[in-house]
Amino acid sequence: MSSLELSADVSTIRANRAGVYLAVLQLVFTLGWTTYVIYLPKLAAEVGIAPSAVILILMLDQAIFTITDTAMGIAADKIAPFVGRLGLFVGALTALSCAAFVALPFVAGTGPVAQAWFIALIVIWAITSSALRAPPLTLLGKHRAKPSVPFLSALAMLGYGLAGAVSPYLGVVLRDQDARLPFVISSVVLLVTALALSRVERGLVQDASSPEKPAEPAKPLGGVPMIFIVSMVILALGYQLHFSINSAPFYLRFAKPADLQWLMPVFWIGFNIAMFPASVVTKRRGGLIVMGAAGLLGALAVLGAELAGNLNTLIVAQFLAGAAWGCMLMSAISAALAIGDSGAEGKVVGLVFSALALATFARMAAVAGGLQKLPEYAPLLHWAPVACWSVAGAGLLVIAASRLQQSVARARGVSSS
């Protein structure tokens, strides 16, 4: 084996390790969020916050994420050219985030007098935790060859999917446990994981195919990127309405409430399995095409879930819907890194996460308003996911086709000249 081949193999191994690291980071962070959601009603009650206000706190979190995810992505673009700085930036903010997170159950235990401190800690935690979403993924776009990005994006999103799959079981296990120990354990594990980012960053920079050069100012986003982000909001809204509002009632047509903890993860099994073969298509055809096709196929799967006449059919439809969402999210990260290739990788990836947070906020607002309980809005909530995924999917395919035609026209112009 030549030294060039050996170097390529080492680079691939390091890249795959970076992808696995990002998967673990997303897994630990998402499980921490799940732990927070499980215990928030109890902790809020200890400081005198009414149960009806808990949803408002969760909406506040998502509103903060909508702003700070993009802000952290922009900050990552400015810091990433200085090797090692991004890891230090993420590590420092994670330490502050974990400190605020650990303090929540202890402050809540002091009673209603600590209500203001409790809210302040939640705000600090929400702001600083945004450092764990877009900034680490920015490294893939800045320091890896483009063909490897879809597979590494699939690896990174695997952590998100695994967390979604185990969340129902985590809720059952932690339901009657004291909050302090889970908060401490999840924070320690998250901090240790985040502190390893500097090492991962240096490994990716070392294997970068091109020598380091001064960072150029990021170019302003044009029309296609903005349409991409709007489409991401619509796709994410379809996911939120289907999975968080409609899926459980779909299952309850054929199963008992106690069975939901076994049935809800079917969606995430499809999510985790489909991303990797879809990453091959994304590598060859681009993220926009995969997003659009997955949106249309996902709309058909949701339609199948809506019309399912038995549990087996519903399980298959939910598996396919999860597979479609996995393809959408993986290809969205890949497309965001490609769109931001001019130095705005963090900004565009941050906008993707902001879109996810905005869609979550909209779903929570619908729940807070009781729309799912109003008969006149039931058809809207049932069919909105189909509309969201089909409209956004078709729009993305049109954009992808237009860009392909422009590329072909430019290629012909160059060849003729």
Predicted regions and their residues:
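Loop-to-transmembrane helix entry
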Residues: A50-D61, F151-A154, L252-G270
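A membrane-interface helix-boundary motif in multi-pass transporters
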Residues: L86, V172-V189, A368-A392
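Glycine-rich segments within core transmembrane alpha-helices of 12-TM secondary carriers
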Residues: P150-V172, F353-M364
